[in-house]
Design a protein with these regions (language model features):
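Central hydrophobic cores of alpha-helical transmembrane segments
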Residues: 2-5, 302-316, 369
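Secretory targeting signals
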Residues: 7-56, 123-198, 218-298, 333-342
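Long, solvent-exposed extracytoplasmic domains/loops
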Residues: 50-155
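Membrane-interface elements of multi-pass transporters and channels
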Residues: 198, 240-253, 298-302, 306, ...
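Short helix-to-coil transition segments within interhelical loops
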Residues: 207-214
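Hydrophobic alpha-helical transmembrane segments in multi-pass membrane proteins
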Residues: 230-236, 315-322
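Junction motif at the cytosolic side of a transmembrane helix
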Residues: 294-298, 346-371
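Extracellular/periplasmic helix-loop-helix junctions in multi-pass membrane proteins
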Residues: 320-340
Length: 371
């Protein structure tokens, strides 16, 4: 089963997660936004103030001079009547399509290193404008007092002055989502036979015939939780080894409420957010483990167990990718919704475990009822 777990994990990785590792940042201008913000952190730290904004404008002016010098001495563009970046922008925004210009432009943008400055000049004004209007970009919701209060907090605490690209944030969210799905499915797959195997071999009747045998129910639950922690830890270690190759550690101290990212109910850094998602994965994994083992203890066949597991996994995976991980603390979802769902799942699971444990102690082996 371990081999099948590894094979399944590799398939899920190749189908979903590998793209976020092999193609990050994904294309242009994502690559240029990433590089610009990495340089911004190197120059200004994880937050940028008004003085540093003026310096960024100087960086833009220098890039503009570099582009003008490039165009003034470039025969390919000179033949098209382009001698400055202004000429280039005018031609580029023209409604009339000039195929020779398009071919030359994309040749430099995609194939020549001289085209890098053109990508940077495209994105730098957007970054500067975003930052300048950072306090005016939020919508006003008069009917949602808590939302307005949180937005005011973000502005007052200057959380939105942080440098964190949404490209970087979404990349991590996608990775933790896909690995989370992989962990959930893997745990369910590995723990389904915990009780079924004994019933299939008629060993459960022998267990009920002894006092010690009845205690095996709790022992198996504990063993299942330990297995879950091992599976989750191994998969997370693999995730962060792979994620390390994306080179995003410079953003770890950035506030997640950056003007270049979304808004959240909490004032935390990117690394703290990562830590909370890891805790969430462990909680979700343990809940999945208990549900899978309880279903295994009630079902008589693998087919019946799988049928029951499909619904539970659908619910758990659905909640994981929509609220419990990918939308954790995001402001457009009620503030305590994720916490309430986590708490509800934990309480329900604990109650079921307690009830099932009590039933196991008094189960009559002659009148045992199974699904």
């Amino acid at each position: 089963m371990v081999c099948l777990l590894i094979l399944g994990s590799l398939i899920i990785y190749k189908m979903f997660s590998s793209f976020e590792i092999e193609f990050f940042p994904n294309g242009r201008p994502a690559l240029d936004i990433y590089k610009i913000m990495v340089q911004m952190i190197e120059d200004y730290g994880n937050d940028m103030d008004e003085i540093e904004l003026e310096d960024l404008k100087i960086v833009y002016d220098n890039k503009l001079k570099e582009a003008n010098e490039f165009f003034s001495n470039n025969k390919d563009f000179n033949d098209l009547g382009i001698y400055s970046y202004e000429d280039y922008e005018y031609k580029n925004s023209s409604d009339t399509v000039d195929q020779k210009f398009e071919d030359t432009k994309w040749n430099y943008l995609l194939e020549r290193k001289e085209g890098n400055v053109l990508w940077e000049l495209q994105e730098l004004p957007n970054i500067i404008e975003f930052y300048e209007n950072r306090n005016n970009r939020y919508s006003v919701n008069e009917g949602f007092k808590k939302y307005d209060e949180r937005i005011n907090e973000i502005i007052t605490n200057r959380e939105n002055e942080s440098i964190l690209s949404k490209i970087v944030f979404d990349n991590y969210n996608n990775l933790i989502k896909y690995f989370g799905i992989c962990i959930i499915i893997g745990i369910a797959f590995m723990l389904t036979p915990v009780f079924l195997k004994d019933k299939k071999d008629k060993i459960d009747c022998l267990q009920y015939a002894s006092k010690h045998g009845r205690k095996l129910f709790k022992s198996k639950l504990v063993a299942g939780v330990i297995s879950t922690l091992i599976i989750t830890t191994i998969e997370l270690i693999i995730l962060f080894i792979l994620y390390g190759g994306n080179n995003t550690s410079m953003f770890f101290k950035s506030n997640i409420n950056s003007v270049f990212n979304d808004e959240f109910w909490v004032n935390i850094t990117f690394i703290q957010y990562i830590g909370l998602t890891v805790v969430g994965i462990y909680v979700i994994g343990v809940i999945t483990a208990f549900i899978s083992m309880l279903i295994s203890s009630k079902a008589n066949t693998y087919i019946a167990s799988i049928g029951m597991q499909v619904l539970s996994l659908f619910i758990i995976v659905g909640l994981t990718v929509t609220i419990l991980l990918n939308a954790l603390f995001i402001i457009y979802i009620p503030k305590y919704l994720a916490f309430i769902i986590y708490l509800a799942l934990i309480v329900i699971t604990v109650l079921i475990i307690i009830t099932s444990s009590k039933k196991e102690k008094i189960t009559d082996i002659n009148n045992e009822s199974r699904i």
